[in-house]
Amino acid sequence: MKPSVATLLATVSLVYAQTATEKEPSLSAIESAAASIQPYSPVSNVEGVAFNRFFQVWLENIDYEDAAADENMKWLASQGILLTNFYAVTHPSEPNYCAAVGGDTFGMDNDNFNQIPANVSTVADLLDTKNIAWGEYQEHLPYPGFQGFNYSNQETYVNDYVRKHNPLVLYDSVTKNSTRLRQIKNFTSFEDDLANKKLPQWAFITPNMTNDAHDTNITFGAKWERSWIAPLLNNSYFMNDTLILLTFDEDGTYSKSNKIFSVLLGGAIPDELKGTQDDTFYTHYSVIASVSANWGLPSLGRWDCGANILEIVANKTGYVNYDVDTTNLRLNETYPGPMSAGEYSKYSPVWPNALTRGDCSAGHGILDIVKETYANTEPTYNYSSPFPYDTASNYNTKVTATKKNVTGTHRSSSSSSPSASSNAAVSAVAPAAGVSGLLLGLALNLL
């Protein structure tokens, strides 16, 4: 029996009882919520062209060279494919997490209590188009869907869980849906889901502030990561057709270009590719594009649209990636936007319009709700570019890219960075949605 709209509205409205707070909630409030909110672990079995499960694990703030020199990182790389040309997209941490699921930084240049409007889509919306189960696992999250700014270690009171390292909780399209919130869980839920064979097909995994190297160092973080991932590499359920990305949010030296050490692992990698390296240019946006290409999903119409696709996927779909000349590439800051606090970019009240036309690198067009939201508008940026740039703020305008040919070498006639004329400055904010309308929409979607 389908529940009534009234029942669904009541269920959806539970999210408002979990008030987002810009400081750490009291322990009593946390314990009260933890006693009543249960994790939700949907499962699915949608076959992809290169993998059937994708998990990514993020560590923090380490320069590429320092990670590459660590013995545990060397061991991890020997088990899979080392990505030698993978870049974060800005500084500091939070905008990279934001970009990894939403395809844009929206000018974010800070680790504040940022909230992205409910009509801005995420990778969760892409996965939902084919009912592909997704989830997050945040170490020491006190309960599913916790929206507080942080949660300290209750014994030592050191930093533990922090909101800025939780990508989907930044988006109101997730936090205003109680079911989606319950898919944001902790490591205890990961162990339960693993044991019960209820892991999702897509997951984002964040260790706590000690294990992710943020408050420690690469030696500590790499040792933790190897000890955590090594047993999973011997778990047949976990490994079967699984692709794992081990990466970092950003490098540790803000004056550098923001290249980060990244490794692909898992049963989806052919034996002959283990211990090899891939020199293709990638960013955090490439991960969204690769997930879309693998499962035949649409694009968000943002920087995921033109992003290079992981070669392990591109070789299956036939997509030809770009070679990007990184000589003049600077991904250590971002362009103006509504999430800027004036730290590494300039504030602008204008929410960028998404792209609504084109196949994108994944080859499956744009998400329908994005096309509806931004109908009859021009994209603010040239989101079909394999790297982010903005002519208005002179951001990465000297970077060039050339399509590879089928053998992976350059074509004889090189192409420069995509036309600046596509980078239109359009003053249009993200359309607003009333709370009642949003709740009704969520309810009707569940019917």
From Swiss-Prot:
Show which residues constitute the signal peptide: 1-17
Induction notes from the record: Repressed by phosphate.
Regulation of its activity: Inhibited by NaF, molybdate and vanadate.
Positions of the pro-segment in this chain? 420-447
How is this protein situated with respect to the membrane? Answer: Lipid-anchor; GPI-anchor
Leading EC class: hydrolase
The name this protein goes by in its record: Acid phosphatase
Q: What's the source species for this entry?
A: Aspergillus fumigatus (strain ATCC MYA-4609 / CBS 101355 / FGSC A1100 / Af293)
Q: Corresponding gene? A: phoA
